Regions:
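Structured lumen-facing ectodomains of secretory-pathway proteins
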Residues: 1-193
């Protein structure tokens, strides 16, 4: 990541090197302020403005990477209450045995298979959408099968997945999609690892 060049690239001396009196210091901040450090843009935001779902009275942001309105979560489900089913495992075909997701949202864990596979398998089993919850801290930006003929699919944090599970175990497996407004959601990480 980052740029492998310096401010002397293509200079008139033909060496692509800074002159001794003009070192290439660039713009550096903590934690890479040590004089011998090579810095790369590697800091994550500690919060994101996101569309959200409401589960049991708590709001959780979601990531929607759909490029078309056909698979956009908000375009399809704005301000609606949706029934969902927690699919065990990772949302592979075998995980749907004995599970009825027809007309509901399939909620699956990250891992085990690709995001487009999770989406396609949920759709093949009758789901109207797929929510993938992270199996580790942080958020997930996933690529999906986009466009007409595919169901919407979004990703949520591990905490949102846990809230969805708790809500389902209480016997009230529904969540509400926001009305196209966003909220700032803080995440646990601030520096890339």
């Amino acid at each position: 990541a980052g740029n492998d060049t310096n401010n002397a690239y293509g200079n008139r001396w033909g060496m692509n090197m800074s002159l001794l009196p003009n070192p290439d210091t660039g713009l550096v901040g903590t934690p890479s302020t040590y004089s011998a450090a090579i810095s790369v843009a590697s800091v994550d935001n500690d919060g994101y403005e996101q569309l959200y779902i409401t589960v049991g009275g708590a709001d959780f942001g979601y990531q929607d990477t759909a490029a078309t309105s056909a698979t956009s979560f908000i375009a399809n489900f704005r301000n609606r209450e949706l029934e969902y089913v927690m699919v065990p495992g990772y949302g592979t075909e075998a995980d749907y045995a004995g599970i009825d997701v027809n007309g509901k949202v399939a909620v699956v864990s990250r891992g085990g298979n690709s995001f487009p596979e999770k989406q396609s398998i949920a759709q093949a089993n009758g789901a109207i959408a797929c929510v993938v919850y992270n199996n580790t801290m942080g958020i997930v930006n996933m690529q999906i099968n986009d466009g007409a003929g595919n169901i919407p699919a979004v990703s949520v944090t591990k905490a949102a997945g846990q809230a969805l599970l708790t809500q389902a175990e209480s016997g009230n497996a529904v969540f509400r999609v926001c009305n196209a407004d966003t909220q700032l959601f803080h995440i646990d990480r601030t520096i890339s690892s």
